[in-house]
Amino acid sequence: MVVNILLFITLIFLLLLFVFLIAFAFLNKRVRNYVVRTWTSVFSKSKQNLDKKNFFDNLTSTLLRLSVDKIGAIIAIEKRDSLDPYINIGYRVSSDFSPELLVTIFYNKSSPLHDGAVIVRDYKIISVSSYFPMTRQLIDVSYGSRHRSALGLSEKSDAVVFIVSETTGKISVALKGVIKTLSSNSDRLQDEIIHYLSSK
C-alpha cells in the first residue's frame, strides 16, 4: 500500500515536472529560439562537412580517371568572385558533382561540350561548355589551350581551376595567375586539392 502511494506520488511529480518544462520552453521564446538555432546550426554544419568531403572524394577520383585515360578537361571551382559572366557563355545546368556526369561530358570528343570548361559552385555543377579568356603570359610550350584559358581565368578571379592534359594526362591547377602540376597519387592529390581550395 505504502509502495503504491509512493509510486503514485513519484509519477505525479514527474508528470508535473514534464508539464512545467514544456510550458517553460514554449513560454520562454528566447530559450526556444536558442534551442532551435543551436540544433539548426549543428545540423547545417554536419551536412556542409559531409558535402565537402564527398566533393573532395569525387573531384579526386574524377581527375585521376581523366588523367589515366588522357582525357582533356577543365574544372573551375568558384570561390568569392562570381563566375556568372562565364556561366552565361556556356550551358547552365544544376547537378550534383558526379564523376559519372563529368565522364559523360569530357569523354565524348564529338560533343560540343568536350572542349569547354565545367564550373562548380557550392559543390554543384552549374555550367558546362564555358570558355575563359586566354592568358597573355609566356608559358611552357607543353601547355595547351586548356592550360592557357585556365590560367587566364585565374588571373581575373580567385577561382581554382583544375586541368587535365589531353597529351600527357598530367593534372594541374591554376590559381592567382600561377599554374602548378599536381600529384598522380590519390592521397597526395586529395591533400593538394583541399589545400588549394582552402587557400584565401
Curated annotation (Swiss-Prot):
Localization terms from the record: Cell membrane
Phenotype reported upon loss of the gene: Probably essential, it was not disrupted in a global transposon mutagenesis study.
Domain DAC: 28-185
EC number(s) given by UniProt: 2.7.7.85
Catalytic activity: 2 ATP = 3',3'-c-di-AMP + 2 diphosphate
Pfam families attached to this UniProt entry: DAC (PF02457)
GO MF annotation terms: adenylate cyclase activity; ATP binding; diadenylate cyclase activity
Superkingdom assignment: Bacteria
GO terms of biological process kind: cAMP biosynthetic process
Ranges in a coiled coil: none
Complex formation: Probably oligomerizes.
Main function: Catalyzes the condensation of 2 ATP molecules into cyclic di-AMP (c-di-AMP), a second messenger used to regulate differing processes in different bacteria.
Protein name (record): Diadenylate cyclase
Gene name in the database record: dacB
